[in-house]
Amino acid sequence: MHILDKVDAAQLRDDIPEFRAGDTVDVHLKVIEGSKSRVQVFRGVVIKRQGSGIRETFTVRKVSFGIGVERTIPVHSPNIDKLEVLSRGKVRRAKLYYLRDRHGKAAKIKEKR
């Protein structure tokens, strides 16, 4: 297993800021369409973070035109151009699945002071 750990450690990113469930983030993702490449921003609330090492992922949720959109992204993905933490959320849970059933003001997360 030591060889696999070394391979994983070589691919880990160190430019990812510290964030957790409840935080509002901007994820700048590289999108390749044909031969062109561009950066697409996905802004939303982190509803879960799971795994460890190279397999670690997080899920970001936003409401776009009245429809909830969730995207699961590997933390150490080379497709992440930049990850910005916009605000820290005040939550008591590690997994915020209950936000899926809430709409409007009920889905709002209080900001840490």
Swiss-Prot record:
Gene3D superfamilies: 2.30.30.790. The keyword Ribonucleoprotein applies. GO terms for molecular function: structural constituent of ribosome. InterPro entries: Ribosomal_bL19, Ribosomal_bL19_CS, Ribosomal_bL19_sf, Translation_prot_SH3-like_sf. GO terms for biological process: translation. GO terms for cellular component: cytosolic large ribosomal subunit. Keywords: Ribonucleoprotein, Ribosomal protein. PANTHER family: LARGE RIBOSOMAL SUBUNIT PROTEIN BL19M (PTHR15680:SF9), RIBOSOMAL PROTEIN L19 (PTHR15680). This protein is located at the 30S-50S ribosomal subunit interface and may play a role in the structure and function of the aminoacyl-tRNA binding site. Belongs to the bacterial ribosomal protein bL19 family. This is Large ribosomal subunit protein bL19.
